[in-house]
Amino acid sequence: MQLDHFVIAVSNWERSNAFYKDVLGAELVEQSPGRWAYRFGQQQLNVHGPGVEPGSNVAQIPVQPGNSDLCFVWRGPIEAAVEHLQAHGLAVELGPVSRPGARGGGTSVYFRDPDGSLLELISYE
């Protein structure tokens, strides 16, 4: 078994779209009219919130903007990730620090998306 996708709630579609595309390099994918997702290789981040039509009413208590905690793999040295974040005007809240990840030990930095969700970049190099 493996993970297929995650869901993130956003409060402002345009602002989040720019962040996830420009800062994290996501591909914007329209799943159906009004339903969007960010794709990172073979992983997908579905988007809920204002300006995005819900696919179903399956989530009785939806995730609120700013309540997510996601980790992305950074391909390259973690110092380059810090430089990338700083170039986009983002503050690193913690790191670089050693962390265990899905592939073993790595080095991580933590920062926030526009809604306050905690994001992590981990490098295994």
Segments (PLM) and residue ranges:
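Short glycine-enriched loop/turn motifs at secondary-structure junctions
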Residues: 1-2, 62-67, 102-103
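Short connector loops at helix/strand junctions that flank enzyme active sites
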Residues: 33, 40-42, 63-67, 87
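Short beta-strand/turn micro-motifs at beta-sheet edges
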Residues: 56-60
